[in-house]
Curated annotation (Swiss-Prot):
Domain of life: Bacteria
Assembly: Part of the 50S ribosomal subunit.
GO CC annotation, single: cytosolic large ribosomal subunit
Leader peptide range in chain numbering: none
Annotated PANTHER family: 60S/50S RIBOSOMAL PROTEIN L6/L9 (PTHR11655), LARGE RIBOSOMAL SUBUNIT PROTEIN UL6M (PTHR11655:SF14)
UniProt keyword annotation of Phosphoprotein present: no
GO molecular function: rRNA binding; structural constituent of ribosome
Function (record text): This protein binds to the 23S rRNA, and is important in its secondary structure. It is located near the subunit interface in the base of the L7/L12 stalk, and near the tRNA binding site of the peptidyltransferase center.
Descriptive protein name: Large ribosomal subunit protein uL6
Keywords from the named record: Ribonucleoprotein, Ribosomal protein, RNA-binding, rRNA-binding
Membership in a protein family: Belongs to the universal ribosomal protein uL6 family.
Amino acid sequence: MSRIGKRIIEIPSSVQASVEGSKLLFKNSKEKHELETHNRVKITLENNQLSFQPVGEDAQSRAYWGTYGALANNIVTGLSTGFSKTLEVNGVGYKVALGNKTLDLSLGFSHPVKYPIPAGIEMVVEKNTITIKGSDKQKVGQVAAEIRSFRPPEPYKGKGVKYSDEVIIRKAGKTAKK
């Protein structure tokens, strides 16, 4: 059984947290996030420490307990340090450029791919490396997955968009007939 819910979340001085009923509000100097929790989870905020308790002893309450503990921890981590994902673009003629609120990708199609950068996401492009930064872990991961989906890496030459820590399992090409 997982014990994620038992963790006490330390809230750093750069992040302010408050509880309003079943709603958790987090903010720092730039952004604010709110988390609507289920009524099967009791929230306690004391001395910059956030903890959750399941209201019932059933499996559903314990599931919510761990889920909301992890979500709150991700928000606190995002507001204090942030999250980032790095993508690499590999291939002949594949290029990446940052436009005005768009990411311009040349990925071998007959047209350039223009990806609008969502609010709360910051992108840095160096050569053929895209770094996606933000305070919302889900949004950073979603944006990275959407950009990767335009041209996923192929197993023969490794061309495409891949995560920097992703390992592409290569296949051998066809062999010549004898």
